[in-house]
């Protein structure tokens, strides 16, 4: 089974203090380091020198281990409580705010792409999800293309040109972008 589970937190350290876990191992050109966000919450052999699993996370997956990514998302620091979160998440964002470069630069995941945002004008969750996918190397050839062209192949899974985002990740990120737009607008 291949699964990719990401869970967002305002402060991942809080959950990691509560959950028994072993940081995932990442190897690159023979160099070992702890994975930035991935942990195993089940027993897995430990490398005490590097303080992470003794099996690379990709190999561990083939052996049936399950890595979970606990991600820090500072956007959640702007949320006051559950009711506020529900309200901000349910609200349709003012997508036109993204046309203002200083505003767009503050928005999570897309702040470095203000010119492309202005050109392509993502104005819905599906379009924002596709936009997030095409700023990854594997789908960069779809930048500045009409939305019809983008949607014809953005979710085809072809990663021959580089790293691609899965549709589920892109939609989740798009929802976070929408939430962040609403939270930033509320602060103005």
Where are these regions (language model features)?
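Mg2+-dependent phosphoryl-transfer active-site scaffold
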Residues: 1-187
């Amino acid at each position: 089974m291949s699964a990719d589970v990401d869970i967002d937190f305002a402060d991942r350290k809080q959950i990691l203090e509560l959950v028994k876990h072993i940081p995932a191992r990442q190897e690159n050109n023979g160099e070992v380091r702890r994975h930035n966000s991935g942990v195993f919450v089940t027993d897995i052999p430990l490398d005490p020198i590097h303080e992470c699993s003794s099996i690379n996370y990709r190999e561990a997956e083939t052996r049936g281990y399950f890595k979970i990514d606990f991600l820090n998302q500072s956007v959640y620091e702007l949320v006051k409580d559950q009711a506020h979160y529900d309200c901000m998440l349910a609200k349709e964002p003012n997508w036109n705010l993204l046309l203002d470069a200083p505003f767009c630069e503050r928005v999570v995941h897309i702040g470095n792409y203000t010119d492309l945002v202005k050109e392509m004008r993502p104005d819905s969750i599906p379009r924002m999800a596709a936009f997030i996918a095409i700023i990854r190397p594997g789908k960069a050839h779809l930048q500045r293309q009409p939305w019809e062209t983008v949607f014809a192949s953005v979710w085809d899974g072809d990663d021959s040109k580089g790293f691609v985002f899965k549709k589920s990740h892109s939609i989740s990120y798009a929802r976070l972008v929408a939430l962040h737009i609403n939270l930033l607008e509320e602060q103005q």
